[in-house]
Amino acid sequence: METTHRVVIGDSRDLALTEDSVDLVVTSPPYPMIEMWDDAFGSMNPAASEALADGDGDRAFEAMHAVLDDVWAELQRVLCPGGIACVNVGDATRTVDGRFRVYPNHARVLSAFESLGFDPLPDILWRKPANSAAKFMGSGMVPPSAYVTLEHEYVLVFRNGERRAFEPGATGRYEAAYFWEERNRWFSDVWTDVRGETQSLEGSEARDRSAAFPFAVPYRLINMYSVYGDTVLDPFWGTGTTSLAAMVAGRNSVGVERDPAVVETFEARAERVPDLSRSVVEGRLADHRAFVRETRDRGGSLDYEAEHYDFPVRTKQERGIRLYEAASVERADAGYRVTHRPVEEGRGS
């Protein structure tokens, strides 16, 4: 199996993609009203900078989201019928004109997608501990003017119309099944076992303009909402974590990024994909074998046999599961080509 991974330097408000050409969107946009993104939003919509200069936080918030609205409209155009869009976004806290408040980015993004006709699906909260050891803001130990510290982000999930249709027995779908115990963990509405990613980019400008999320977030979402051979789009590509996860998960990807300096940092990450892929796949197999042992130790039973591995599984739909590892990564036109091979029996044991 081969997958391709393109990176486009451009503006996500005008995607150079045909209609219905991607199967899944996984992205983490710049968050409105987070100070590090003020200049970026101001360059795309001067009304945002003007509102901040006037001390009008509400107007700045809306002007920044107007930029994102144009991107969401493009996603509606390029996402296939029934395709899923996953948007990782956090709320912002900020003092503007002497008044501290929260700016609810997740609610504004939800409203924008609904206005485009997307169906909202249950969302996910994942814990992202703040860098500061202090768990409060404001007046310290004296009530009532301290503020809760935001330590979570949202993964908003939307479907583009009716459920996606598949041919009965589609191989790519059933090989892409996840384990029962993975489903229980991944489809929980609160993720406490992922952590925010520390940036390590070369050059202060590239580092300042990055908003990466941890690998586990896009990797899970890609496995949850796509099948082998699908194409995943990230319109705010940044450090390329979504493409990295797609490479490991056996999906194609397209990334769009405005800053060439950020894109240049990805090659070193791509070179490590075979090792990362091997580690992830072996970890999943080892975790399932541990689940089998624990289930049997408790006197439980697993009633189905996996077709490609020598272990049992809990449900009939898991029987065809087949994990692939990235055997090689090569540079290709405007991106990378990855060759995948199925992981044979005996790995991860």
What residue spans do the PLM features occupy?
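Core SAM-dependent methyltransferase catalytic element
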Residues: 80, 116, 145-164
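Active-site-adjacent helix-turn-beta-strand microarchitecture at beta-sheet edges
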Residues: 169-180
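Proline-centered turn/helix-capping motifs that create local helix->coil transitions or kinks
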Residues: 163-168, 183-186
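S-adenosyl-L-methionine-dependent nucleic acid methyltransferase catalytic domains
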Residues: 1-137, 146, 181-349
